[in-house]
Each structure stands twice: as structure tokens, then as C-alpha cells.
Amino acid sequence: MQETPSVPSNSSSHSQSVLTIQRQVSALGSSSTGPTSLKTSSTPTPGQLKTKVPNVRRMRRIISEDAEWSLAIVPLLTELCIQHIVKNFQNNPILKQLPLEHQKKVLSNLPPELPLTVTANLIDDENYWHRCCIKRWSVCHVSRHGGSWKRMFFERHLENLLKLFIPGTTDPNVILDLLPLCRNYVRRIHVDQFLPPVRMPTPLQGEEQSDSGSEGEGSEPEKDHYQLQTLVGGLKHLEELDLVYGVKDCGMNFEWNLFLFTYRDCYSLAATIKACHTLKIFKLTRSKVDDDKARILIRSLLDHPALEELDLSHNLIGDRGARAAAKLLSHSRLRVLNLANNQLQAPGAQSLAHALAHNTNLVFLNLRLNCIEDEGGQAIAHALETNKCLSVLHLGGNKLSEPTATLLSQMLTVNTTLVSLNLSCNHIGQDGGKQLLEGISDNKTILEFDLRLSDVSQESEYLIGQVLHANREAARQRTLNPGHFSSPTNNCTENSVV
């Protein structure tokens, strides 16, 4: 009886142990399959890795090592539009239709390499043209161009085209196509080089033709330079024309013909300046202009409505050219005349003096480095006794001596308009210096008097300097207190009128 119940207990325990073993085996199986499946699922392919691994950089709200980082990941729509406008500006220039703040952003991002056909008449922003100038030229003197960067760009761009133009080789449309783009901005043209045509080698001729004695016919090349008439006629605001007919940096290819101002050039230039009614300043220097060519040019300037300054210095002008200039003084509103370093002598200076005695416009006359001598110097001194407008006179290097100094001394006692007088590099001498000292002692208006290398004694130079210092101090006081130095006659006149 006791053994019978023990059997089922053993069998039940056995079955429980078997069940327990099966559960453990199944558990082991499940545990073994579980990590295996997890392991296989945790090793994704490279493509799955890119999509499932989070971007730690985007999750960080502050990135201290990146000073330009911003939490705004997507740019504003306006910024995208501005970027698109800048990128496609050459094909679709949209600027005036934008608000002012957006225009500034577009202009600040535009590249300076855009074609002038797009930007010339559309963009007026000085900052943009400033970037264009700085990118193209290392040295930029914007003050010489009225303080405008846009004007500077177009003036210098046009000048570069003119300097490199080769007649017969360069296409004239290169310059004429620029005219509609720059006509409103160019006020000054300064060209210090005009290239001549390229000299082509003469073809070999047969013996029969060479023996005929005509081998030189037609072999001389053209020497005329670029003609400015069409260009200047299209520049409606042109005020200054500064030209030099020569070649720079010619090196071993130097020839005198490179510096030739031909008659065709002269006639064309004369017609050009005559038709330009806005021209105020005309300069033609270092171009071998002789009397005949000077007369042609000056004839075209008679009764010019706007001309105020004429500079023909460093040329070959003699007395005949000086007489033409004297006639111009009576038939123009010229205020500045520069004939320095020419071939003027006494007759030419006398012609100028005769016109100067009755002139009421000229304030600056430069005759240095000529040879007017005492006859011409005395004539000018006589003219200044009656002239009431000239304020600057330069007679340096003209072989003047004591007789001229005597008359200049008399002139200084009565002249009240001359402010600057230059007699340097002459033979004034000690006696002439003393006479000038006597004359300037009674003069209260002259502020500059140059007597260097004129054989004047140091004592006279010192005393003249003291007089000039007193005149400058008085002029400064008049500038600071203009009402205090008003003349009594003016006050009486004003009181009587009141």
C-alpha cells in the first residue's frame, strides 16, 4: 500500500522534471534565437545606416565651434529669390521693380564682371562701380573724376580703348559701340598716347619697275591717328579734352614718326573742338604743335561759347602762334592760358601784352621757358598797369634782366589784382632785386613772389619775404573778418542808398 502511492509521485516528479527541462530547452532555444535575430537586425546595410542614424549636429541647438551656425536651417524665401535674381541677372536684370532694401542686397551681391550693356544704364549705385574700379585698376583717384566712381569707370575705360586703338587694325565699332553706354557719364577725356597705323612691309618690286625711278611712290605709310570727331560729337556732357599725340613705352622701336601730329589730325581735331559747345578745358601738350597747326586750332576756338582754359605747353609754337592766341583773348571768355616751354620771343609777347591790356577775363598766364627777353617782359609789365583781372603770372626762364625788373617794380605799385608772380631762372641781378623790393613794399595784394636763381641778393629776398608774410597775414584777417575791413567808401555808399 505504501509502495503504490510512491510510484505516481515519482512519475509525476519525473514528468515535471521533463516538462521543466523542455521549458528550459525551449527557453534556451528562444534565448538563442532571440539574440541572433536581434544581432542580425542591428547590423543594417550602409543605405539603411544613413537613413536611420540621427544627425547629431541638427539635434544640437548651439554649436560653439561654428560662429556662423544658425538654428534656421531653411533660408527665407526672399533670400532664395534674391539669390536667383543675382544668378540670372545677366539674362533677366530685375532691379528697379524690387523694394529698396532688396535692391541693396542684389547690388551688393552682383559680380563686377557683368557686361556693360546690362549695367551701364541700369545701375547707379556708387558702391557697385567702386568694386568695378578697384577690381580693374590698382590705383584709383576718384577726385579727378568729380568724386563719382561710375564716371571714373567709364572715363578710364574709354581712355584705355583710345590708347590701344590702332588705325587700320582695330575695329572702330569697339569704341562707337560704347558711346550709347557712356555718353551720359563721360565729362573728361585724358589720352596720353595715340598709336599710329601699323607699318606694313613694302612688297618687292621687279627690276624694271625699280629702274623706272618711281619705287618710292605710294610706299610711305599713313601716319594719321584715330579721329575723335564722331566720338566727341556723341558725348553731350564733355567738358575737358586732354590729349598727347605720342607713344609711351615704345622701347627699341623708337622712331620720330611715332610722335607726329599730322595736318589731317590737326584739321580733324579743330573741327572736333569747334563742334563741342560744352568744352571748357582743352589741352594739347607734347605733340610738336608748330605755328601753322596752332593757328588752325585757335581759329576754330574763336568765339567759343564755353572755353575757359587753353593749354598748348611743351610744343613748338612761335610768334605767329602767339599772335593767334592774342586774338583768341579778345574773342573768347578764356580765363587760363598756358604757353609754357614753346618758342615765343619778344614779338609774340608784345602781341599777348597788347591783348592783355584790354582783357577782362584772363586770370592765369604761364609763359615760362620761352625767350621773350626784356622787350617782351617790358611790354607785359606795361599791360599789367592797366589790366584789372590777371592774378597769376609766370615768366620764369625767359632771359629777363634789370630793365624788366624796373618796369615790374613800377607796375607793382599800382596793380591791385596780381597775387602770384614768378621770375625764377632769370638774370634780375642785385639792382633789379632792390627795385622790385621798392615796388612790392607799396603792394598789399601780392602773396607769392618767386625769385629763385635770379641773382637777387639774400637781403632783398629776405625783405621781400617779410612783405609777403605781412600781405598773407592781412589776407587771412580779411578772410576771417570780412566786414571789419570793408572800405569807407562802400559804407558811405551803402548808407546813402539806405
Swiss-Prot record:
<dbReference type="InterPro" id="IPR052410">
    <property type="entry name" value="DRC5"/>
</dbReference>
<keyword id="KW-0282">Flagellum</keyword>
<feature type="repeat" description="LRR 2">
    <location>
        <begin position="306"/>
        <end position="327"/>
    </location>
</feature>
<feature type="repeat" description="LRR 4">
    <location>
        <begin position="361"/>
        <end position="382"/>
    </location>
</feature>
<comment type="subunit">
    <text>Component of the nexin-dynein regulatory complex (N-DRC). Interacts with DRC1. Interacts with FBXL13/DRC6, DRC3 and DRC7.</text>
</comment>
<feature type="repeat" description="LRR 1">
    <location>
        <begin position="276"/>
        <end position="299"/>
    </location>
</feature>
<feature type="region of interest" description="Disordered">
    <location>
        <begin position="200"/>
        <end position="223"/>
    </location>
</feature>
<dbReference type="InterPro" id="IPR001611">
    <property type="entry name" value="Leu-rich_rpt"/>
</dbReference>
<keyword id="KW-0433">Leucine-rich repeat</keyword>
<feature type="compositionally biased region" description="Low complexity">
    <location>
        <begin position="28"/>
        <end position="47"/>
    </location>
</feature>
<feature type="repeat" description="LRR 5">
    <location>
        <begin position="389"/>
        <end position="409"/>
    </location>
</feature>
<keyword id="KW-0206">Cytoskeleton</keyword>
<dbReference type="InterPro" id="IPR032675">
    <property type="entry name" value="LRR_dom_sf"/>
</dbReference>
<keyword id="KW-0677">Repeat</keyword>
<dbReference type="GO" id="GO:0030317">
    <property type="term" value="P:flagellated sperm motility"/>
</dbReference>
<keyword id="KW-0963">Cytoplasm</keyword>
<dbReference type="GO" id="GO:0036126">
    <property type="term" value="C:sperm flagellum"/>
</dbReference>
<dbReference type="Pfam" id="PF13516">
    <property type="entry name" value="LRR_6"/>
</dbReference>
<dbReference type="GO" id="GO:0005737">
    <property type="term" value="C:cytoplasm"/>
</dbReference>
<comment type="function">
    <text>Component of the nexin-dynein regulatory complex (N-DRC) a key regulator of ciliary/flagellar motility which maintains the alignment and integrity of the distal axoneme and regulates microtubule sliding in motile axonemes. May play a role in the assembly of N-DRC. Required for sperm motility.</text>
</comment>
<keyword id="KW-0966">Cell projection</keyword>
<comment type="similarity">
    <text>Belongs to the DRC5 family.</text>
</comment>
<dbReference type="GO" id="GO:0005856">
    <property type="term" value="C:cytoskeleton"/>
</dbReference>
<keyword id="KW-0969">Cilium</keyword>
<feature type="region of interest" description="Disordered">
    <location>
        <begin position="27"/>
        <end position="52"/>
    </location>
</feature>
<protein>
    <recommendedName>
        <fullName>Dynein regulatory complex subunit 5</fullName>
    </recommendedName>
</protein>
<feature type="repeat" description="LRR 6">
    <location>
        <begin position="417"/>
        <end position="438"/>
    </location>
</feature>
<feature type="repeat" description="LRR 3">
    <location>
        <begin position="333"/>
        <end position="353"/>
    </location>
</feature>
